[in-house]
Amino acid sequence: MAKVISFFISLFLISFPLYANDYFRADSRTPDEVRRSGGLIPRGQDEAYERGTPININLYDHARGTATGNTRYNDGYVSTTTTLRQAHFLGQNMLGGYNEYYIYVVAAAPNLFDVNGVLGRYSPYPSENEYAALGGIPLSQIIGWYRVSFGAIEGGMHRNRDYRRDLFRGLSAAPNEDGYRIAGFPDGFPAWEEVPWREFAPNSCLPNNKASSDTTCASLTNKLSQHDLADFKKYIKRKFTLMTLLSINNDGFFSNNGGKDEL
């Protein structure tokens, strides 16, 4: 009997792989749409072209959304959660009116911030277990997707042929310490006087701030977030270049001749 139980447990694990270090997002966009866009881009990136408004990459604003609970038109993050089950639950709540939607599986990387970890007791929706992707999720970070039809997940995961495991292998979400300074609480918000945020608070965010009115906490937070996003993109670009060179070498593009490499 024990062997039979062990067999079915093994079969279950093989049939439904666990993604302990990956993240999940329910989205109405089809894989073809995502591919054409180069990934899961934030709403603010689209709206920036139409409205001519800057993208807001303030984590607290993102987590709160609008008064109706919808995504802000200038939002610079893309939401994910920690389990397939949670993503399905959120998808049914937000996308239940669609006959079909998708749950994307996303590789861990430092562009993902733990909303509950960074915002602490000020996180507005802690039950969602959100990890917010700063600047969106590039196509190369998407491992694959599940199709949801009339509320039910159909079959297994479809793998994304453009996923770059070599770029994201071994990476993890950003540590909370990297997120405290871009938490984005409003000017003079109580959290800026509390641990841990007061240790990381930009001067413009402190309650006793006397900076000029054109240097607000929100504007400074956006600048810091833009800097972090630029650093992440540079890191991925450098790693991509390195992996490309290594693959060329491994494929025999370079031939060894008397201890010398030549084209």
Swiss-Prot record:
Keywords: Disulfide bond, Enterotoxin, Signal, Toxin, Virulence. One of its GO terms (cellular component) is extracellular space. One of its GO terms (molecular function) is molecular adaptor activity. NAD(+) binds at residues 26-39. The active site is at 130. Residues 1-20 form the signal peptide. InterPro entries: Enterotoxin_A (IPR001144). Disulfide bonds join 205-217. Belongs to the enterotoxin A family. The biological activity of the toxin is produced by the A chain, which activates intracellular adenyl cyclase. Heterohexamer of one A chain and of five B chains. This is Heat-labile enterotoxin IIB, A chain. The lineage of its organism: Bacteria, Pseudomonadati, Pseudomonadota, Gammaproteobacteria, Enterobacterales.
